[in-house]
């Protein structure tokens, strides 16, 4: 660390300690809150209809580059509903998972270590070695017991966050990797000014809690030695805001452009290809595993990454999508609709042709039941040929946060009916829904 950064960092620590003593004294002896006291069913406003599957509602996703302008009440645990709509908290061997998936009736989950600030992934209770830049949006568990993870890789030279893909064994040994550099440039970034934009404006005010979390990830040993865990926990509750310029001293990745923001991956054709959903490109693309080349792409109307478009979609395509899935020659995705200011979010289905993306044709859409835009997160999962499970994702700050919101739906495409729906109470949300 450069001398000027050391001085600035120590000064910040001294200031925060002073503020803690002055303003935090009244609460110094009070216990911190615990998710163990939370009843998961308190999040649920209503459940209607019947689901044959067990439904997993995952926690909300957080990562290094996410702005703090969306609700995150489910970040500490997930909900699971049995076929009888009985809600239960998922029991894991850690208190604060931030993502949960389920493979072979076993949970794969991730969290941030309170000791080191590192991103950690566990499957069936065992830690899986990832990488320094591990991203939590999606994983693949292969039949041979290996894993494919996504990475958000910062590049200080061009101030960009690039996409990395790695297939590893349980010990972290790299079996295959791919890097977006050389394939994708940040000039194709489709920026939505009011979205969960990972590039912070220069005048943005950031809460001290966010700053300290970032500092701890970069300088964890120093922070722990100077502050100690207990004092650190007190500091994150202080409502102090510092400017972006101050924040930049302690996070070298601030103001880097997250121009891809991949949020789902799926292997295709016996693992010859990988389908990637790239939210900030308003596009999907397919990588040929053997060559690393992008061999297929499809974009929404605002995408400059590709000229390939869907046929027959009343919107002309999708925007800032999540969770692209191929199932029986159909392409399913969640259209967050960030760039469509007057249209609600939706689940949408197209035909799929791996030889020619321009043959993709609109088949079906299901609009957000309350006609709202859900600007972040969300998921789509085909349960069979006719039924889709939709997780509706984030609720932005504003009037909508004061209302009940739909959390998940099961829709029958054949007759365009809702078979099952769960609504959250105001302020609750989930990253995605999965049926098993």
Listing of model-derived features with the role each one plays in the protein:
Residues 1-14:
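N-terminal Sec-pathway targeting helices
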């Amino acid at each position: 660390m450069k001398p000027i950064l050391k001085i600035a960092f120590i000064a910040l620590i001294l200031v925060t300690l002073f503020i803690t003593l002055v303003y935090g004294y009244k609460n110094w002896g009070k216990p911190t809150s615990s998710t163990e006291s939370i009843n998961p069913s308190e999040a649920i406003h209503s459940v209607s209809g019947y689901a044959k599957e067990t439904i997993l509602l995952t926690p909300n996703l957080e990562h290094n580059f996410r702005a703090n302008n969306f609700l995150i009440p489910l970040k500490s645990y997930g909900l699971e509903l049995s076929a009888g709509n009985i809600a239960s908290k998922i029991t894991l061997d850690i208190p604060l998972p931030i993502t949960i998936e389920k493979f072979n009736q076993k949970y794969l989950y991730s969290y941030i270590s309170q000791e080191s600030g590192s991103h950690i992934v566990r499957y069936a209770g065992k830690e899986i070695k990832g990488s320094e830049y591990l991203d939590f949006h999606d994983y693949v568990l292969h039949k041979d017991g290996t894993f494919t993870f996504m990475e958000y890789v910062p590049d200080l030279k061009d101030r960009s966050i690039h996409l990395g893909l790695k297939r590893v064994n349980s010990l972290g040994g790299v079996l295959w990797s791919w890097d977006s550099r050389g394939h994708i440039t940040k000039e194709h970034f489709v920026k939505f000014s009011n979205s969960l934009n990972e590039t912070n404006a220069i005048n943005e005010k950031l809460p001290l809690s966010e700053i300290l979390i970032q500092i701890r990830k970069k300088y964890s040993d120093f922070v722990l030695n100077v502050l100690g865990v207990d004092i650190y926990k007190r500091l994150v509750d202080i409502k102090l805001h510092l400017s972006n310029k101050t924040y930049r001293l302690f996070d070298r990745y601030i103001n880097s452009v997250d121009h891809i923001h991949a949020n789902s991956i799926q292997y295709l054709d016996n693992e010859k290809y990988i389908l990637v959903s790239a939210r900030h490109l308003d596009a999907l693309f397919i990588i040929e595993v053997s060559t690393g080349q992008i061999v297929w792409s499809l974009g929404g109307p605002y995408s400059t990454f590709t000229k390939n478009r869907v046929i027959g979609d009343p919107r002309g395509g999708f925007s800032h999508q999540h969770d692209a899935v191929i199932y029986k020659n159909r392409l399913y995705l969640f259209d967050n609709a960030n760039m469509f200011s007057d249209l609600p979010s939706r689940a949408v289905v197209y035909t799929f042709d791996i030889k020619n993306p321009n043959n993709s044709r609109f088949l079906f859409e299901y609009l957000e039941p309350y006609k709202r835009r859900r600007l972040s997160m969300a998921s789509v999962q085909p349960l069979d040929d006719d039924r889709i499970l939709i997780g509706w994702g984030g609720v932005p700050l504003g009037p909508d946060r004061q209302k009940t919101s739909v959390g998940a739906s099961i829709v029958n495409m054949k007759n365009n009916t809702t078979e099952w729906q769960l609504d959250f109470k105001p302020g609750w949300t989930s990253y995605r829904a999965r049926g098993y």
